[in-house]
């Protein structure tokens, strides 16, 4: 038997906590036998004293084990259970293509996703732009969809990592969110509860990233890879660029439209293609569905070219109560904004920088995201035809097409877009889509 205050004191004095002490504390968070003040105190001591790798692994596994851990063995699936997690960005619609692509290659992807947070778009919000799409199927239905289709994208239920929910709520109001061991534990507790064989992390870098600097993004990626592998799940991470909107669109319905066009081959943004393929390659190799990069890319290109990936996406939408002909008739089903028109720069030049975070917040301000949990989303608003870094901008080339609910909203968004995109008389040096691969 442990005392919460003694565990806090031990960490306060700079000592490492044992696995048993960490489990006692996390179970107390779940059971409400640990007070909010005690949670806040431990969070602050971890913020200042950090955690050793064994402590980080123990924290993550204790939070994972505070609720249901999915077990797929009874289904006798003939492929690996794999998933991807992104730290979030703007125009980051990779999940909608990646899940079906990997499933079409023989993987099983039980993706538990989130809503938009701050300036970043949420996969669940995007999917809810599809009429009827059910993000909360019951456990049996979730398992059936994984078995039959190979991929399902759902919301987090209260039974998965419940201790994390209470821990995070306290961190949010005590200035302890930005602690790498606590971020790592929070992300991985939910992902590892999916019962995965392998995981790939997409850690964003740049003006639209969760972490403010490249060095902190790198440190987070290394921590996640170390902890997840320590917890027994094969994990790699990619550091990917978020110095500009990843897709050609940002919003909800507009990104779903682009995802379908990507899968069918109607239109593929080159940077979005690079990042999506790179993440899928990691999933196939970690899941032992391909022996190397070349084999993985060939398999993935094949399922795009022969229509299997698009077919899997369509089957997933239908299985989750969306329209059965969604892929064929997406324009019929997706909402469109009342006003769609281009915004042009006031001067000419090359795009040298982009405040991606500000562009994400502009989508939120138009109604495409939530400022508080009770807000309703306007799924139709957002940006399309986004200009890229290095593009030559003049009176013919707009910065973006803005989809807004009315003229006032359009004007506010246009002002935000102009302020967020910097022009110069010289084109900037090109930056990679993927900066680094982390395996340990």
Curated annotation (Swiss-Prot):
Q: Could you state one GO cellular component term attached to this entry?
A: cytosol
Catalysed reactions, as listed in the record: thymidine + phosphate = 2-deoxy-alpha-D-ribose 1-phosphate + thymine
Q: Which PROSITE patterns does the UniProt entry name for this protein? A: THYMID_PHOSPHORYLASE (PS00647)
**What is one Gene Ontology biological process annotated in the Swiss-Prot or TrEMBL record?**
pyrimidine nucleobase metabolic process
Q: Which domain of life is it from?
A: Bacteria
Describe which pathway this protein belongs to, using the record's wording. Answer: Pyrimidine metabolism; dTMP biosynthesis via salvage pathway; dTMP from thymine: step 1/2
Q: What family does this belong to?
A: Belongs to the thymidine/pyrimidine-nucleoside phosphorylase family.
Q: Which PANTHER family match?
A: THYMIDINE PHOSPHORYLASE
**Which NCBIfam families does UniProt cross-reference here?**
PRK05820.1 (NF004490), T_phosphoryl (TIGR02643), Y_phosphoryl (TIGR02644)
Q: What is this protein called?
A: Thymidine phosphorylase
